[in-house]
Curated annotation (Swiss-Prot):
One CC-aspect GO term: chloroplast thylakoid membrane
Family stated for the protein in its record: Belongs to the complex I subunit 6 family.
Keywords, sorted A to Z: Chloroplast, Membrane, NAD, NADP, Plastid, Plastoquinone, Quinone, Thylakoid, Translocase, Transmembrane, Transmembrane helix, Transport
Pfam family, one: Oxidored_q3
Coiled coil location: none
Gene encoding the protein: ndhG
Protein name stated in the entry: NAD(P)H-quinone oxidoreductase subunit 6, chloroplastic
EC number: 7.1.1.-
Quaternary context: NDH is composed of at least 16 different subunits, 5 of which are encoded in the nucleus.
Subcellular location: Plastid, Chloroplast thylakoid membrane
Record PANTHER family: NAD(P)H-QUINONE OXIDOREDUCTASE SUBUNIT 6, CHLOROPLASTIC
Membrane-spanning residues: 10-30, 32-52, 61-81, 92-112, 152-172
GO MF terms, alphabetically ordered: NADH dehydrogenase (ubiquinone) activity; quinone binding
Protein backbone atom coordinates (compact mmCIF):
# COMPACT_ATOMS: atom_id res chain seq x y z
CA UNK A 1 0.00 0.00 0.00
CA UNK A 2 1.19 3.47 -0.75
CA UNK A 3 0.47 5.12 2.57
CA UNK A 4 2.11 8.15 4.14
CA UNK A 5 4.95 7.37 6.53
CA UNK A 6 3.21 7.97 9.89
CA UNK A 7 0.11 5.98 8.90
CA UNK A 8 2.25 3.12 7.61
CA UNK A 9 4.30 3.11 10.82
CA UNK A 10 1.16 3.19 12.98
CA UNK A 11 -0.37 0.25 11.11
CA UNK A 12 2.91 -1.64 11.35
CA UNK A 13 3.11 -1.13 15.13
CA UNK A 14 -0.61 -1.93 15.53
CA UNK A 15 -0.35 -5.19 13.58
CA UNK A 16 2.88 -6.12 15.36
CA UNK A 17 1.27 -5.62 18.75
CA UNK A 18 -1.71 -7.64 17.52
CA UNK A 19 0.70 -10.43 16.60
CA UNK A 20 2.26 -10.33 20.06
CA UNK A 21 -1.08 -10.33 21.87
CA UNK A 22 -2.43 -13.10 19.65
CA UNK A 23 0.71 -15.20 20.09
CA UNK A 24 0.51 -14.82 23.85
CA UNK A 25 -3.15 -15.81 23.64
CA UNK A 26 -2.25 -18.98 21.74
CA UNK A 27 0.28 -19.97 24.38
CA UNK A 28 -1.35 -18.78 27.61
CA UNK A 29 -5.09 -19.32 27.19
CA UNK A 30 -6.20 -22.52 28.97
CA UNK A 31 -9.16 -23.23 26.68
CA UNK A 32 -8.07 -24.76 23.34
CA UNK A 33 -10.97 -23.11 21.50
CA UNK A 34 -9.79 -19.67 22.57
CA UNK A 35 -6.23 -20.60 21.62
CA UNK A 36 -7.40 -21.66 18.16
CA UNK A 37 -9.29 -18.38 17.70
CA UNK A 38 -6.20 -16.53 18.86
CA UNK A 39 -4.17 -18.43 16.24
CA UNK A 40 -6.70 -17.29 13.64
CA UNK A 41 -6.21 -13.70 14.81
CA UNK A 42 -2.43 -14.08 14.46
CA UNK A 43 -2.80 -15.44 10.93
CA UNK A 44 -5.12 -12.59 9.95
CA UNK A 45 -2.61 -10.06 11.32
CA UNK A 46 0.15 -11.69 9.26
CA UNK A 47 -2.07 -11.47 6.20
CA UNK A 48 -2.64 -7.78 6.86
CA UNK A 49 1.13 -7.31 7.15
CA UNK A 50 1.47 -8.88 3.71
CA UNK A 51 -1.10 -6.42 2.38
CA UNK A 52 0.83 -3.59 4.01
CA UNK A 53 3.98 -4.71 2.17
CA UNK A 54 2.19 -4.78 -1.23
CA UNK A 55 2.09 -8.56 -1.51
CA UNK A 56 -1.61 -9.01 -2.14
CA UNK A 57 -1.41 -12.50 -3.63
CA UNK A 58 0.46 -13.90 -0.62
CA UNK A 59 -2.05 -12.19 1.68
CA UNK A 60 -4.97 -13.76 -0.17
CA UNK A 61 -3.29 -17.17 -0.10
CA UNK A 62 -2.62 -16.72 3.63
CA UNK A 63 -6.27 -15.96 4.31
CA UNK A 64 -7.65 -18.74 2.15
CA UNK A 65 -5.26 -21.53 3.09
CA UNK A 66 -4.22 -20.88 6.67
CA UNK A 67 -7.19 -19.02 8.12
CA UNK A 68 -9.92 -20.41 5.92
CA UNK A 69 -8.89 -24.04 5.87
CA UNK A 70 -6.24 -24.98 8.41
CA UNK A 71 -7.46 -22.88 11.34
CA UNK A 72 -11.07 -23.91 10.75
CA UNK A 73 -9.90 -27.54 10.71
CA UNK A 74 -8.07 -27.03 14.01
CA UNK A 75 -11.16 -25.43 15.58
CA UNK A 76 -13.33 -28.25 14.24
CA UNK A 77 -11.00 -30.90 15.71
CA UNK A 78 -10.77 -29.12 19.06
CA UNK A 79 -14.56 -28.88 19.32
CA UNK A 80 -14.81 -32.67 19.19
CA UNK A 81 -12.49 -33.10 22.15
CA UNK A 82 -13.75 -33.92 25.61
CA UNK A 83 -14.10 -30.62 27.49
CA UNK A 84 -13.97 -32.18 30.96
CA UNK A 85 -10.17 -32.34 30.82
CA UNK A 86 -9.87 -28.59 31.08
CA UNK A 87 -10.76 -27.47 34.55
CA UNK A 88 -11.48 -23.91 35.55
CA UNK A 89 -8.48 -23.57 37.87
CA UNK A 90 -5.62 -22.22 35.83
CA UNK A 91 -2.06 -22.92 36.96
CA UNK A 92 -0.07 -20.14 35.32
CA UNK A 93 3.44 -21.50 35.84
CA UNK A 94 4.66 -25.09 35.93
CA UNK A 95 8.07 -26.71 35.55
CA UNK A 96 7.33 -27.58 31.92
CA UNK A 97 6.43 -23.98 31.20
CA UNK A 98 9.68 -22.83 32.77
CA UNK A 99 11.76 -25.24 30.71
CA UNK A 100 9.88 -24.28 27.56
CA UNK A 101 10.32 -20.57 28.17
CA UNK A 102 14.04 -21.09 28.85
CA UNK A 103 14.46 -23.00 25.58
CA UNK A 104 12.45 -20.41 23.63
CA UNK A 105 14.40 -17.52 25.16
CA UNK A 106 17.68 -19.23 24.30
CA UNK A 107 16.56 -19.78 20.70
CA UNK A 108 15.43 -16.15 20.47
CA UNK A 109 18.78 -14.87 21.78
CA UNK A 110 20.69 -17.10 19.34
CA UNK A 111 18.49 -15.96 16.47
CA UNK A 112 18.92 -12.29 17.36
CA UNK A 113 22.71 -12.63 17.67
CA UNK A 114 22.84 -14.45 14.32
CA UNK A 115 20.77 -11.73 12.65
CA UNK A 116 22.95 -8.98 14.09
CA UNK A 117 26.25 -10.72 13.23
CA UNK A 118 25.33 -11.66 9.65
CA UNK A 119 26.60 -9.59 6.76
CA UNK A 120 23.54 -8.83 4.68
CA UNK A 121 25.45 -7.48 1.68
CA UNK A 122 24.94 -10.62 -0.40
CA UNK A 123 21.22 -10.69 0.35
CA UNK A 124 20.80 -7.10 -0.83
CA UNK A 125 22.80 -7.89 -3.97
CA UNK A 126 20.61 -10.92 -4.68
CA UNK A 127 17.48 -8.82 -4.24
CA UNK A 128 18.81 -6.18 -6.62
CA UNK A 129 19.70 -8.85 -9.14
CA UNK A 130 16.18 -10.27 -8.94
CA UNK A 131 14.71 -6.81 -9.40
CA UNK A 132 16.73 -6.52 -12.60
CA UNK A 133 15.53 -9.98 -13.67
CA UNK A 134 11.96 -9.08 -12.77
CA UNK A 135 11.65 -6.61 -15.64
CA UNK A 136 12.30 -9.34 -18.23
CA UNK A 137 9.68 -11.74 -16.85
CA UNK A 138 6.36 -11.96 -18.61
CA UNK A 139 4.00 -13.72 -16.22
CA UNK A 140 3.02 -12.75 -12.71
CA UNK A 141 3.52 -16.29 -11.45
CA UNK A 142 7.25 -16.05 -12.20
CA UNK A 143 7.41 -12.75 -10.30
CA UNK A 144 5.55 -14.32 -7.36
CA UNK A 145 8.00 -17.23 -7.37
CA UNK A 146 10.98 -14.87 -7.26
CA UNK A 147 9.44 -12.80 -4.46
CA UNK A 148 8.58 -15.90 -2.42
CA UNK A 149 12.11 -17.24 -2.77
CA UNK A 150 13.87 -13.93 -2.03
CA UNK A 151 11.94 -11.07 -0.43
CA UNK A 152 9.30 -13.05 1.47
CA UNK A 153 11.26 -16.24 2.11
CA UNK A 154 11.72 -15.74 5.85
CA UNK A 155 8.07 -14.83 6.63
CA UNK A 156 6.84 -17.67 4.44
CA UNK A 157 9.04 -20.20 6.22
CA UNK A 158 8.21 -18.79 9.66
CA UNK A 159 4.48 -19.18 9.09
CA UNK A 160 5.02 -22.76 7.96
CA UNK A 161 6.96 -23.48 11.17
CA UNK A 162 4.22 -21.84 13.25
CA UNK A 163 1.62 -23.95 11.46
CA UNK A 164 3.64 -27.12 12.01
CA UNK A 165 3.99 -26.41 15.73
CA UNK A 166 0.27 -25.62 16.00
CA UNK A 167 -0.72 -28.85 14.26
CA UNK A 168 1.62 -30.93 16.41
CA UNK A 169 0.18 -29.26 19.51
CA UNK A 170 -3.39 -29.86 18.36
CA UNK A 171 -2.64 -33.52 17.67
CA UNK A 172 -0.95 -34.03 21.03
CA UNK A 173 -3.83 -32.35 22.87
CA UNK A 174 -6.35 -34.41 20.91
CA UNK A 175 -4.58 -37.67 21.80
CA UNK A 176 -4.68 -36.91 25.51
Amino acid sequence: MDLPGPIHDFLLVFLGSGLLVGGLGVVLLPNPIFSAFSLGFVLVCISLLYILSNSHFVAAAQLLIYVGAINVLIIFAVMFMNDSEYSTDFNLWTVGNGITSLVCTTILCLLMSTILDTSWYGVIWTTRLNQILEQDLISNSQQIGIHLSTDFFLPFELISIILLVALIGAISVARQ
